[in-house]
Amino acid sequence: MGGNPPIKNHTIVNKIVSSRKIERIVIFTVYRDNWEPYMKKYTEVFQSHFPNLNTACLLLDTEQIDFNSYLDADLIIIGGGNTEKYIATYVNQEFKNYIVHMLNKGAKVIGFSAGALLLGEKVYVSPNDNSDHQIKIKNGLGVFSQFLISVHYDSWNDKANKDRAEELVDVTIISLNDHSCLVLDKLGNIIEKID
């Protein structure tokens, strides 16, 4: 997803809910003030489809997680927020192994903003998204590798920054507006872009 929750595009919601029954959602986030009420925004669109939804919210920056306790997730959501904090928290081999394992089991994985960015092999961090106000290219989880993504493209007016970043990485950076998304297969190939 290119922006923040909730998902407002019904096409995206319908693709997710029609693909499999969702009984358990696991949300990975990082600590920030008032984080708990915000988590409902990630799941509210699914509540009407699946009223008995079981949801777990995990903060890897403040707690140790046994990933084996979350192997029953049908939908994994990686939240948004401070991109560099998300990268420092989630870009590691253990989390990558968990995500790849869950994709191979058929779970759906959704990243919002920072959570979408870190799914790539490389991560484009816009100058609008860090305190140094510089273009940064960081390592990601490697779920996809043929391209990078730019989030909040429209609201950040990020075209010039994205174009400069493409010259640095010599690979396409796909722009995602706040209510856009890319649908990928489990190998990271693009199935569809929904605007």
Features from the language model and the residues they span:
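Active-site-adjacent pocket-lining segments in enzyme domains
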Residues: 72, 87-108, 115-195
